[in-house]
């Protein structure tokens, strides 16, 4: 790994320098595995590296967009404490002097013990956290949110029950020195409220 920043990575693979339009060191490990497999299959090195250089992140996995004002939004599926920590660790390595704002939630009718851990991790690796809903299902979303904020040691967070509003308001108020992470849904294009699947897409918002 030669360079690692918000525009991607410059890496040396088999004595060839290539630029990757993806972020996150764990993505590099996946790419190296692909390259090793291509060598086993005896695929031409230059052809393999050319294909690898064009790889895009999977939808909703450290998928990012740079706005017209220079701020950066990242959407990721991370919905467990471990996954959230991995994503935020990757972002912190390339943040520079940017601040990190994270939008998080936790699913309803699922393991309640992870909720305060989500709050703890988000607080530890972010400058500010917005706690919102994420597939509340048959639970009251505010009960889920209250479980999450039990993991906070400070009041460096806010609550916005409406996920769409949380994202819109955050986008309106960030500048070119801010990275906004929207975690939890990634590729999903719905919110599960009760037994209903309501259209919702973090990336499109």
What are these regions (language model features)?
Residues 12, 19, 63-65:
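Residues in well-ordered beta-strands of folded domains
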Residues 1-2, 141:
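Short, charged, surface-exposed secondary-structure boundary motifs
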Residues 2-17:
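Acidic-glycine-rich active-site phosphate/pyrophosphate-binding loop
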Residues 7, 23-24, 33-205:
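ATP-dependent carboxylate-amine ligase
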Residues 17-25:
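A short glycine/serine-rich beta->alpha loop
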């Amino acid at each position: 790994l030669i360079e690692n920043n918000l525009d991607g990575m410059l890496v040396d693979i088999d004595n060839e320098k290539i630029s990757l339009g993806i972020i996150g060191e764990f993505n590099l490990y996946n790419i190296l595995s692909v390259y090793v497999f291509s060598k086993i299959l005896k695929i031409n090195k230059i052809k393999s590296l050319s294909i690898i250089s064009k790889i895009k992140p999977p939808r909703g996995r450290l998928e990012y967009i740079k706005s017209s004002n220079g701020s950066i939004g990242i959407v990721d599926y991370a919905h467990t404490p471990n996954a959230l920590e991995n994503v935020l660790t990757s972002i912190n390595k390339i943040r520079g002097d940017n601040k990190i704002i994270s939008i998080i939630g936790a699913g309803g009718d699922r393991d309640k013990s992870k909720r305060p851990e989500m709050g703890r991790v988000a607080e530890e690796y972010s400058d500010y956290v917005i706690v919102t809903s994420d597939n509340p299902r048959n639970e009251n979303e505010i009960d889920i949110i209250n479980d999450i904020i039990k993991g906070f040691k400070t009041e460096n967070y806010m609550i916005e029950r409406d996920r769409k509003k949380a994202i819109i308001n955050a986008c309106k108020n960030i500048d070119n020195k801010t990275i906004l992470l929207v975690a939890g849904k990634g590729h999903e294009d719905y919110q599960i409220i009760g037994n209903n699947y309501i259209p919702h897409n973090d990336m499109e918002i």
